[in-house]
């Protein structure tokens, strides 16, 4: 059964379809948003062999003309060079402002294609077909698009909402165990930031998600998308509540920068570590009891996930250098670094009242495998 989460943003409202075999139904689902039967698809070298043919068949059966660009897979694709290549592809395909382009892939492709759509002809529409768990529950929803800079991640971009999101649960079967767990880092984040009952549900049903239970996976994606949609509607451009979605990300982005945005640390793995460190920091500040971060770590470890910097298989900089990398975070306001802290599971909030000394002590402990 397909479930639909509606994102009510006025004339930019859209639906998120969650269910099985949505790739096979893509032509019929996309056709109503088209003004002419033509689309341009951008995907990557990992996704194309797995899913591009199926999407093309669905579009062809619906009478929709299409062309595809296949980019290299990996975080390095979120660059000026690949943005330029994508825009050249759209222009060569004569994509007009009223047309639709399709992002078929994980978070990297979704972010890149969304940004290209935002700036092409001052804004063309785009459809997200996320093929990773991380993209289905996070990056494909909410309109954040962008690329990376030398100075940090996601520092160049725009808010540009999709016209439709198709989250096909079946494509998750093609993910490696590591990639699925990386996406789970974003799923568990929703329970930690504002939905304690969902975190409890994950503690019970996490093994079923890993085992491939489609009903459990659909429910996890639905709840995650609904939570994100509710927050985005309240605060589309991250002036308030939406910042809560960055729980764990200040630590995460510094760790990603330190590992060169490479496969030594996947984004969702960094989020999981970041969430564990955010709750550890909260406990050290006296905002919550030590039992809370212990419970968070216990669940992440039970799912086979990284929880500490010492779990990263790479040489890491000193705590002071990691803290300096945090200074490039998007949540810096007037030179002040804001953190997402928590009073309990499901009770996150934004604060700048976190001393450098506390952060350094948390980083140092997390780098020591004896403290894990």
Where are the language model's segments positioned?
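ATP/NTP phosphate-donor binding region
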Residues: 1-100
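C-terminal charged capping/lid subdomain of soluble metabolic enzymes
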Residues: 3, 185-187, 287-372
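Solvent-exposed alpha-helices and their adjacent loops that cap or buttress functional pockets
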Residues: 8, 34, 94-96, 119-121, ...
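Generic secondary-structure signature for well-ordered alpha-helical cores
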Residues: 60, 92-95, 161-164, 170-177, ...
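Short glycine/serine/threonine-rich phosphate/pyrophosphate-binding segments
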Residues: 108-115, 136-137, 254
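A glycine/threonine-rich phosphate-anchoring loop and its flanking beta-alpha core
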Residues: 115-208
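Active-site segments that bind and position negatively charged phosphate/pyrophosphate groups
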Residues: 200, 204-320
């Amino acid at each position: 059964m397909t479930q639909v989460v509606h994102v009510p943003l006025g004339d930019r409202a859209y639906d998120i379809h969650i269910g099985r075999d949505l790739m096979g139904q893509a032509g019929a689902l996309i056709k109503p948003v088209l003004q002419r039967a033509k689309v341009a698809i951008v995907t990557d070298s990992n996704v194309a062999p797995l899913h591009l043919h199926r999407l093309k068949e669905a579009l062809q059966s619906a009478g929709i003309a299409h062309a595809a660009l296949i980019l290299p897979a990996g975080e390095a694709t979120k660059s000026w060079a690949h943005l330029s290549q994508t825009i050249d592809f759209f222009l060569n395909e004569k994509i007009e402002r009223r047309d639709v382009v399709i992002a078929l892939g994980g978070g990297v492709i979704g972010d890149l294609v969304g940004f290209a759509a935002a700036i092409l002809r001052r804004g063309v529409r785009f459809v997200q077909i996320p093929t990773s768990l991380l993209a289905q529950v996070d990056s494909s929803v909410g309109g954040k698009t962008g690329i990376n800079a030398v100075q940090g991640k996601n520092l160049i971009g725009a808010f540009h909402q999709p016209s439709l999101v198709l989250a096909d649960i079946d494509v998750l079967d093609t993910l490696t165990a590591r990639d699925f767990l990386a996406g789970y880092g974003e799923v568990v984040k929703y329970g930690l930031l504002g939905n304690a009952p969902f975190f409890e549900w994950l503690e019970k049903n996490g093994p079923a998600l890993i085992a491939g239970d489609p009903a459990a996976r659909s429910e996890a994606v639905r709840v995650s998308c609904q939570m994100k949609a509710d927050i985005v509607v309240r605060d589309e451009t991250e002036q308030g509540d939406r910042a809560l979605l960055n729980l764990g990300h200040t630590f995460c982005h510094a760790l990603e920068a330190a590992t060169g945005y490479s496969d030594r640390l996947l984004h969702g793995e960094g989020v999981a570590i970041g969430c564990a460190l955010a709750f550890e920091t909260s406990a050290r500040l006296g905002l919550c009891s030590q039992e809370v971060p212990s419970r968070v770590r216990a669940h992440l470890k039970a799912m086979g996930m990284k929880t500490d910097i010492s779990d990263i298989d790479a040489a890491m900089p000193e705590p002071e250098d990691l803290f300096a990398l945090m200074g490039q975070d998007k949540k810096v306001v007037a030179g002040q670094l804001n953190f997402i802290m928590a009073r309990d599971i499901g009770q996150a909030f934004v604060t700048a009242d976190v001393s450098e000394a506390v952060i350094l002590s948390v980083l140092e402990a997390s780098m020591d495998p004896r403290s894990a």
